Amino acid sequence: ECALAVGGGFEVRSRQAEGQEELEEPEAHCSGQAAAAEAVAWRAVEAGSAQRRCATAADAGALYSASAAAGLAYGPAFRTVEAAWAGDGEAAARLRRRAALQGTQVHPADLDGALQASSLLARGGGEGGGATRLPFAVNAARLRGRAAGALLAEVEGRGAEAAELRLAAGAWGERGAQLEGFRSRVLASDAAVPPQKQHLYVTA
């Protein structure tokens, strides 16, 4: 459920379905502030440009195998990365064509594909391969038009932890989504929760 507050604040949370187990307090998953976006320049994604800058081809199957080893198992519907390339602090991915947006401007699975591509960025420090990284925060998210058809994701590093993500559709990449100041955090081994008897979701 999404709870709205006066002033534009929101919180996305879930609760156990009645009849499964004893009802508990809602569990918050994210919170934020919604506001009208200021006029900013939209950075279009040029088809082929990111691949030319990212010279190292990455295997999509290996990407999902590494994700599973790190504790992030993606079902077939969320394995949207078809091809990927990595470069110096930059990555690009071609996502599977989606026939229907199901009432959205940008399908959540497609946006998640752009987040998956961010794992290709070379990270400094001692939190490298094998660590489970989870999305933590986004400074700003912007949508522009309906992103249907073939999609290209670009990820550009912004320091050790932050990145800018662009998900675009169309020949000139003028439709899609931008995430500014995206940050992920390493999940500490002692913070992982035990397996649940009743999941709040089903892996698609």
Language-model features, listed with the residues they occupy:
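Acyl-thioester-processing domains in fatty-acid/polyketide/NRPS systems
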Residues: 1-204
